[in-house]
């Protein structure tokens, strides 16, 4: 057996590669900064004071550990696997994003940075970044595509309330990819005082590994909680994937447990065959974007194709390089779910459990509705409920009205 098949949690290598994916594809001006960040992060990881402070904020500010909840009514409805929900939507700010933001802001402060920049799609990472910047009294600038600003107005207002400046990005389709491009441009011109707080397991090394490490608290807690409740490990894990940080947070602590089946769910939008989707692994090819090599949605000329998903947090045309590698070696199974399937799962979760999930998380739930009924009753399935659905009310209302009109 190769090293890569037995120690799956050891990546990346010193250059930031997970197999053929990852790396540091950045402008020369950024390279010293990236290397400095990697050094600082390695030092922080070994520093008991940093770990202690991180644990304090995770507990008393974020509200961790988040519950691992037995979804009795979902389980009854499916009539198969026993379904547990990892309740990340109960965190401060309503999603998993804060786990990473609290870690990175402590690092930024350690490095003496005074200005924080970030990109956001659904607005949840923007809100979480603005939140931690407010808590530590740092200047905060959020880049957000105009399309996303339109569909996530409540989150834009939240960011401004928290003291952040929200800069609209009109380039491209005005979504996450474009916001990330602008944030990288800002960083290049303000390297001295600025810390770029990336929101997912993408970007140049050390970001994919660093974000994963801060999110891995999800999977570590899940191991302990399920052991306490069921006396054993789960049989399967399910999580939605845009860039892939909530999924990597749940998956990573289980990668070396061969008995645990791992399923990542991409956004199929209108369907993979239509070309209007955000499924980089199921409908993309390898290429370089935002500082790393990964699977991307691109045309024959290598130009990035715009991603589509009803969920603003999933319509990124790439995926974290560690996911690309796990797909490549076959450790994780990557499936996809359409807008309609996600909406159906969204409604079922509301009615059956009294929990309004984010549309991102509803993609994972849709996969559960497909799989759980085919599995035995002693199969333990853990689903990452990555965020709450408050931000999606407008989208769901609009979709319901449109559907109603189409029927008449």
From Swiss-Prot:
GO-annotated molecular function: tryptophan synthase activity
UniProt function note: The beta subunit is responsible for the synthesis of L-tryptophan from indole and L-serine.
NCBIfam families to which the protein is assigned, alphabetical: trpB (TIGR00263)
Gene designation: trpB
InterPro entries: Trp_synth_b_CS, Trp_synth_beta, Trp_synth_beta/beta-like, TrpB-like_PALP, TrpB-like_PALP_sf
Pfam families hit by this protein: PALP
Gene3D superfamilies per the UniProt record, alphabetical: 3.40.50.1100
Pathways per UniProt: Amino-acid biosynthesis; L-tryptophan biosynthesis; L-tryptophan from chorismate: step 5/5
E.C. number(s) listed in UniProt: 4.2.1.20
Family: Belongs to the TrpB family.
Stated name of the protein: Tryptophan synthase beta chain
This protein's record includes keyword Lyase: yes
Species for this entry: Pseudomonas syringae pv. syringae
Record's catalysed reaction(s): (1S,2R)-1-C-(indol-3-yl)glycerol 3-phosphate + L-serine = D-glyceraldehyde 3-phosphate + L-tryptophan + H2O
Taxonomic lineage from the root: Bacteria, Pseudomonadati, Pseudomonadota, Gammaproteobacteria, Pseudomonadales
């Amino acid at each position: 057996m190769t090293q890569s098949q037995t120690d799956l949690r050891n990546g990346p290598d010193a250059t930031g590669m997970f197999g053929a994916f990852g790396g540091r594809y950045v402008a020369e001006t950024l390279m010293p900064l990236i290397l400095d960040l990697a050094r600082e992060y390695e030092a922080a990881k070994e520093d008991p004071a940093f770990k202690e402070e991180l644990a304090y904020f995770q507990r008393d500010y974020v509200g961790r550990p988040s519950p691992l909840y037995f979804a009795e009514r979902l389980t009854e409805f499916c009539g198969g696997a026993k379904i547990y929900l990892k309740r990340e939507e109960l965190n401060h700010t309503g999603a998993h994003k804060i786990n990473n933001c609290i870690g990175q802001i402590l690092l930024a402060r350690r490095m003496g940075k005074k200005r924080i920049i970030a990109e956001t799609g659904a607005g949840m990472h923007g809100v979480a970044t603005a939140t931690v910047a407010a808590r530590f009294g740092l200047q905060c600038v959020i880049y957000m595509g105009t399309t996303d600003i339109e569909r996530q107005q409540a989150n834009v207002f939240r960011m401004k309330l928290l003291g952040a400046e929200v800069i609209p990005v009109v380039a491209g389709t005005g979504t996450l990819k474009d916001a990330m491009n602008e944030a990288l441009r800002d960083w290049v011109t303000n390297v001295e005082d600025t810390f770029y707080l990336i929101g997912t397991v993408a970007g140049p090394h050390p970001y994919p590994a660093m974000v994963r490490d801060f999110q891995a608290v999800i999977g570590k807690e899940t191991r302990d909680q399920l052991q306490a409740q069921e006396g054993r490990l789960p049989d399967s894990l399910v999580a939605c994937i845009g860039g892939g940080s909530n999924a990597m947070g749940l998956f990573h602590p289980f990668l070396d447990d061969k008995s645990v089946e791992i399923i990542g769910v991409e956004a199929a939008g209108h369907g993979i065959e239509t070309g209007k989707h955000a499924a980089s692994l199921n409908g993309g090819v390898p290429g370089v974007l935002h500082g790393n090599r990964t699977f991307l949605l691109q045309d024959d000329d290598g130009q990035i194709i715009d991603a589509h998903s009803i969920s603003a947090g999933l319509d990124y045309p790439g995926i974290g390089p560690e996911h690309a590698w796990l797909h490549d070696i076959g450790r994780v199974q990557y499936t996809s779910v359409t807008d309609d399937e996600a909406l159906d799962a969204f409604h079922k979760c509301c009615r059956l459990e009294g929990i309004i999930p984010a549309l991102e998380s509803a993609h994972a739930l849709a996969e559960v509705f497909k799989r759980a009924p085919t599995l035995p009753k002693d199969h333990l399935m853990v689903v990452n409920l990555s965020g709450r659905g408050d931000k999606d009310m407008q989208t769901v209302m609009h979709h319901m009205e449109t559907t109603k009109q189409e029927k008449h």
